[in-house]
Amino acid sequence: MKLVFGFVCALFYSFMSFGQITQWTDINYANDSLEGHKLDIYLPDGGQTEYKVVVLIYGSAWFANNMKQMAFQAMGKPLLDGGFAVVSINHRSSGDAKFPAQINDVKAAVRFIRAHADEYRLDTSFIGITGFSSGGHLSSLAGTTNGVKVYKVGDTEMDIEGNVGDCTSFS
């Protein structure tokens, strides 16, 4: 009986906690079939016409390409409670593609957000970005390379902006 009561309480709490948010899951931001190119969008229960956005990037030492749900569970709820739309993204792992593919994916997700802002009620005048561990590194890199298309060190050049997805005009 205690087990059933505990289960019912947990079920009730889960509906109470997440029942009011609007969500879209597994949206492919690059118009391909890669797991590493999916994102989830969550809107708080506020009835606003649009919401400022925070992008979440998971940490995985760049080894995983499908942990966006974990990032939302860890950091998304407090952001929703603060009135922000939360976009939790996947990116290609280091096993799937070499650097700078991961930052190209992050920037492609941001371009997708800008291109589809009206559809998902997102206010792109403010797009924050955060993450933990390798996701924190990618969020810092995204912030410090905003507007930088090519990174050059000596004779080596890297395309930091990338051309992932259909929304390249929203860079």
Question: Could you describe each region identified by the protein language model?
Answer:
Residues 61-66, 86, 112:
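Serine-hydrolase catalytic-loop signature spanning alpha/beta hydrolases and amidase-signature enzymes
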Residues 19-49:
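N-terminal cap/lid segment of alpha/beta-hydrolase-fold proteins
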Residues 50-61:
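Short beta-strand element of the alpha/beta-hydrolase
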Residues 111-171:
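Primarily recognizes the serine-hydrolase "nucleophile elbow" in alpha/beta-hydrolase
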